[in-house]
Amino acid sequence: HGMTEGNLKKRYIGTTDEDLINTDCLKGDYPKCERVVASPLKRCIQTAEYIYPNVDIEICDKLKECDFGDFENKSYEDLKDNPDYQKWLDSNGELPFPNGETHEDFKNRCKDGFFESLTERDTAFVIHGGSIMAIMQKLFGGNFYDYQVKNGCGYEFEMRNGEIVDDYSPIGCG
């Protein structure tokens, strides 16, 4: 999705429903599609409407960003002296977010939402950075953070009958 105020201020923005603040990062080349699936949060819907103005948007709740719990809408500066945050950092992000989602539950939710949304039609998924990383790791392996993307960026790959038939390539970020 495009840039939000929380992204600009480097906050953990998961369940907070923020609007886009600009579309500058959405000037890249995006693949044509017959359908769009998006997270229900405004930043994804607004991005989908901007990139694909003539395509109906289908909503998938399971593709929402992670629930960051007590870290939600806070920055590193806000959290750096919090012992729970330090424990989470020391775990390489594997510990559950206090009063939020576990990393594994989040990744499984995103994977399930992705596969439930697949059809034989060319589909663009307009979702969150964390959701992209979760799906890519589940599909292609490797480290979760290997798939980190900037706002407006993502990956393109081909699947048939639920199977990957082509390696991924980066998209967006003109």
Where do the language-model regions lie?
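Active-site-proximal alpha-helix that buttresses catalytic centers in soluble enzyme cores
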Residues: 2-55
